[in-house]
Regions:
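Short, small-residue-biased leader/transition segments that mark boundaries at the very start
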Residues: 1-5
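Short, structured beta-strand/loop micro-motifs enriched in basic residues and often containing a Trp
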Residues: 6-14
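FNR/FR-type flavoprotein reductase catalytic core
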Residues: 17-168
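Short cysteine clusters
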Residues: 171, 176
Length: 178
C-alpha cells in the first residue's frame, strides 16, 4: 500500500538509535524521501528482461534496496539470483523476504558464521566458474569496497555491472554543501 513505509536502520549514532526505537504509528517530525531515481529496470521492456539472467549482489544494508528490485522483477515473472554478503550471521538482513522472491539465494559471511564463508566475489566466481552459471547483468549495492571488487571481477568476466552511488551521497538534498 502507498501509505506504508518500511525502514531498515543500522544503529550507529543517536539519531539512528532513536529511529530504531520507533513503533508502528509513531511519527517523524520531518521526513524526506525517497530520493534518487527508480531502478533502471522499470524503463526496460519486460519481455526483453525475461530473456536475461540477472545477478544481484547485496552487501550489508545494501540488501534493503536490492529487495524491492528483485521483488519487482519476480512479480513480472523474472527470476534473479541474489547474493547477500554480511560480516557476521547477526548482520544478515531480509533473508526470509529475499527467499520468497529470488530465483536462487546465496548467503555468505566474512567470518563463516553463516552460509558460505568468505566474500561475495568468491560466490560470484564459484557460480560462474564452478557451477557454469551465465549472467547477462549484475547489480551490486553495498559498501564501496565491496562494489569495487565486484566490478573488478565482473569486468574480468565480461559481465555488465550496475552499482549504487548512494554511499557517496551525504544527505541527498545538497543542504550539506557537498
Amino acid at each position: 500500500a502507498s501509505d506504508v513505509y518500511k525502514r531498515q536502520v543500522q544503529e550507529v549514532g543517536a539519531s539512528t538509535v532513536k529511529m530504531s526505537e520507533l513503533k508502528a504509528g509513531d511519527s517523524f517530525r520531518d521526513f524526506v524521501g525517497p530520493l534518487g531515481c527508480a531502478s533502471e529496470f522499470v524503463e526496460e521492456d519486460i519481455e526483453e528482461l525475461k530473456k536475461q539472467k540477472i545477478l544481484f549482489v547485496a552487501g550489508g544494508l545494501g540488501t534493503a534496496p536490492v529487495y524491492p528490485q528483485v521483488k519487482w522483477l519476480h512479480e513480472r515473472g523474472i527470476d534473479a539470483d541474489v547474493i547477500i554478503g554480511a560480516k557476521t550471521k547477526d548482520l544478515v538482513i531480509m533473508e526470509k523476504e529475499m527467499e520468497e522472491v529470488a530465483g536462487n539465494l546465496y548467503v555468505t559471511t566474512d567470518d563463516g558464521s553463516y552460509g558460505r564463508s568468505g566474500m561475495v566475489t568468491q560466490v560470484i566466481k564459484d557460480l560462474v566458474e564452478k557451477e557454469g552459471k551465465h549472467y547477462d547483468k549484475c547489480v551490486a549495492i553495498g559498501p564501496m569496497i565491496m562494489m569495487k571488487f565486484v566490478c573488478l571481477l565482473t569486468k574480468e568476466l565480461n559481465l555488465p555491472t550496475i552499482v549504487s552511488m548512494n554511499p557517496v551521497m551525504v544527505d541527498g538534498t545538497g543542504m550539506c554543501g557537498a
